[in-house]
C-alpha cells in the first residue's frame, strides 16, 4: 500500500443502499468510493478496516447549494420574526455589523456541523457582510471547513451599494469595489482547487441587485471568467426586489443579470431564487450553464438543474437538510 494513502474502509452489508450492484456495501479510500461490492461478493482488495452497517442505510452525501453561516448566530430575533425580506434585513443588518472573527468561526463551525449531522458532505456558503475587522472572513471559513473535513464551495460575497447610495445595507457593512475585487482574486489564488477531487473552491458572489452596483456586477463577471471560477447571487427573491429593479435598473432581475454579462457562458453561475418571476423572461435559455435553488421552479424545469439550499438560517431552525431533500425528491 502506498504510504501516502489512508487505509481502505469497507462499509459492509448495509440494511439498504441507494446504489445498484452494491448490496454488500462500498469500499472507501482517501475520501473516495473505490469499489461497489455486489451481492455474494467480497472486495477485490482486502479492506484494512471494516464497518458493520447492517443497522444502517447508506445514502450519497447530500449537497447544500446555498447558506449563510453567520446568520445562525441571530436565530429567532423577536423583532425579525414574520417579516418580509427587506424589513427582515433592516432589523438584522445592525446585528451583523458587529460580527467578529470569533463569531464567524463559531457560526461557520456550528452551521457545518449541523449540515454534516444531517448527511451533507458538500456545502456552499454565501458570506457577504464585511464590517471593519472582518476582512479575513473567508479565510476563517476555509480553516473551519478544513478542520471539520467538509468539502465546501465558499463564495466571496460582496456589497458596495449602501443606504447612502440608494441601497438597502447600512454603510458600515459594505466595501468599495476595488477592495472586493482584489480580495476575490487573492482568495482564488490562495484557496481555489480546480479539477476532480477538490475539497475547497471559491466562487464570486455579489449579494443582490439591491446591494451592489452595476459596475461591480459586471466586473465580477469579467473576473470570474478570467479566473475560471463560478458566480453566485440572490435573484428575484421577492416582489420588493422586482419593484426595486424596475425602478432603479428599468428592467426585471433576470434581464438585469443579462445586462451585467452574467449569462454569457463561462464556468456558470448559481442563484438562490425564491419567488417565480412574472415577466415573460421567466427562465434562462437551456444552453446557459446554471443551477438554481428555488422554492418553486416547475415552469423553469427544462432549463435548470434544481438543488437543495438553506435559506434564512437566522430563522428559528437548525441547518438540517434532510427534510428539504424529501421536498426536492417529491417534485
Where is each model-derived feature located?
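Alpha-helical scaffold segments that flank or form the walls of functional sites
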Residues: 75-126, 131-151, 181-196
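A conserved active-site cap/scaffold subdomain adjacent to cofactor or substrate pockets
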Residues: 276-278, 284-321
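Divalent metal-coordination and catalytic microenvironments
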Residues: 14, 31, 55, 66, ...
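Histidine/acidic-residue-rich catalytic or RNA/ligand-binding cores of hydrolases
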Residues: 76, 164, 239-251, 279-284, ...
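His/Asp/Glu-enriched, well-ordered alpha-helical/loop segment
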Residues: 259-266, 308-331
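Metal-coordinating catalytic core of metallo-dependent amide/deamination hydrolases
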Residues: 131-273
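Histidine-centered catalytic micro-motifs
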Residues: 61-72, 230-239
